[in-house]
Every structure is written in C-alpha cells, then in structure tokens.
Regions:
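Alpha-helical transmembrane segments and adjacent TM-loop junctions that form the membrane-embedded core
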Residues: 2-15, 19, 42, 48, ...
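The first (N-terminal) embedded transmembrane alpha-helix
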Residues: 20-30
Length: 297
C-alpha cells in the first residue's frame, strides 16, 4: 500500500528566480556596455560568463516550475526529477566556467594585460551587490533543495569573483602589478571549484537514484525491523523524486493486528522523522520465496 505525505512542500521560488534573472540580465547589459566602451576584454569575458549564469537560472527556474506539475499517465511521478537535472547542469556549468577562467588566468600570468583599474573596480562593486542580493534570495531554501543550492552557489561564486576583482583592481592601482588580476582569479577559481565539485557529486548521486545523503538507510532498516509485528524485511529502496521529495518502498514480513493502523503509523513516522513523502509498504505474512537481495545504494 502506498501513502503520499507531503508534510513540507517545496517553497515557491518563483519570485526569487524572477528577481535573480532580472538583476543578472541588467548586470550583463551594464558590464558588456562598460567593456565595449573601455575596450576591457576582462569585462567583456565576465559579461559573457554572467550571461551563462542567466541561462543557468532560467533552467533552474523552469525545473522548479515543472516539479509542481501534476502527474500524468506518462509521468506517474511527475516531473520533479527535472530539479535534480537542473542542479547537475548548474554544477557542470560552474566547473566549466571556473576552468575557463583558470585557463585564461594562467595564460595572462606569463603575459599580464593592463586593465583599467578604476572602471573595473566600479563595475565589480556593482557586481558584488547584485550577486550577493541574488544569492540571498535562495539562502533560506538552499539547505532543503539542491536546485536552490545550485542557484545559490552560482550567485555566491559570482559575488566572490567580483570581490576578488575589486581587490585585484585596487592592488593594481596602488602597485601597478598587472599580474595580481590573474593570480587572484586563479585563487578564487580553486575555492569555487571545491564547492562546485560537492554540488556535482550530490546531484550526480541523486540523478542515479542514490539514497539522499541526509538519509541513513541502515538506520531506517533497523527502525523498521524493531516495529511491532515485523519479523523481517527485504527489498528496501529509497530514492529521490526531486531535490525536495523522497520515496521509499519495502517488503515487510509482518504478523500483527490491524494492517491499516500499522501502515498509517509507519508512513507518518517516516514522513515526520525523515521527510520521506511517498512510502510504499508491502506486508507479507511469511518470508517471500521470490525476495530479491536488498541493494544498498
């Protein structure tokens, strides 16, 4: 018997995405215009990078919208998996962007390019405010939603890059050391890569139906086996339906009294304690001869 408990529906991130897309689009126009007027390749390159951020936000936003669509005959779990794929895309996009910045920075270390320090600093200061504001829009939802976490990291990474650009520009204006620009870019890129790698690992794990990192499968199995009337279990599977919803299915060898009361109690406990929204329990009066070996994921 399957029970669906949506005790904690995902937050409506529509307003956050609207503001973030609007702010980033405006900044791309500003930065691209400043780069074209000053002839700064650095600003033009960063404007192109921020344009990919807008694309990433639009994909994450679209996935969040799809996740709320009702189930259909063809998509019986709904389209929540789109949020996992969006998080995976964002992680890859961040890593690719960081790799491109690092490659360009390494090239410039051997042949530093003079940059218009004051103009770059002013544009970067605006970028700090815009990206920090965008990141804060997703801050509260990032812990419970990997899709929101991907958007948050995208914006936080850009804010960090803008901060590094300000420091580098200030240093160049004071010392005249043009190599500070690529050196700082490399340092920040490495820090961002570490965080993005964690997002990529988790998103890839979930996209392959892995048990969400915050759920202890062994502990749940132990808890189920200790319930009244349970003689054993097999085929325990836990997998993500989206970045915010999880499903569980298990066969229980059970010799209790009222099956409906037992199922209600167990499904409520799993929903409240572990946030597992959809639970399917198959009760068996004796061990099933066709039981498959439990697969730990």
């Amino acid at each position: 018997m399957a029970h669906d408990h949506d005790h904690s529906p995902p937050a409506d991130l529509g307003p956050a995405f609207r503001w973030a897309v609007g702010l980033n689009t405006g900044y791309v126009i500003l930065e691209g215009t400043a780069g074209w007027i000053t002839g700064s390749l650095a600003l033009l390159a960063d404007a192109a990078h921020n344009l990919t951020d807008v694309a990433g936000l639009l994909i994450a936003w679209g996935a969040a919208v799809l996740a709320k669509r009702a189930v259909t005959e063809r998509h019986t779990w709904g389209l929540g998996r789109a949020t996992i794929l969006a998080a995976l895309f964002n992680a890859i996009a961040i890593l690719v962007g960081v790799g491109a910045v690092t490659w360009e920075a390494v090239q410039r270390l051997s042949d530093p390019v003079a940059v218009p320090g004051l103009t770059v600093m002013l544009v970067a200061l605006i970028g700090i405010g815009m990206n920090t504001g965008s990141a804060l829009l997703f801050m509260s939802a990032r812990k419970g939603d990997l899709n929101a976490k991907g958007a948050f990291l995208h914006m936080a990474a850009d804010a960090a890059v803008s901060g590094a650009v300000v420091l580098a520009a200030a240093g160049i204006m004071v010392t005249g050391w043009d190599w500070l620009d690529p050196a700082v870019a490399i340092a920040v890129s490495l820090l961002i890569a570490v965080t993005a790698a964690g997002l990529f690992r988790e998103a890839l794990h979930l996209s392959l139906d892995g048990v969400p990192f915050e759920i202890d499968r062994a502990a749940i199995a132990d808890w189920l086996e200790r319930q009244d009337g349970v003689q054993g279990l097999h085929d325990l599977h836990i997998w993500p339906l989206s970045t915010t919803r999880t499903a569980l299915a298990v066969h229980l060898v059970w010799q209790g009294g009222d099956p409906d009361a037992f199922i209600d109690r167990v499904t409520d406990a799993l929903a409240n304690a572990h946030g597992i929204a959809n639970v399917t329990l198959q009760l068996e009066r004796r061990p099933c001869d066709r039981a498959h070996a439990a697969v730990a994921s």
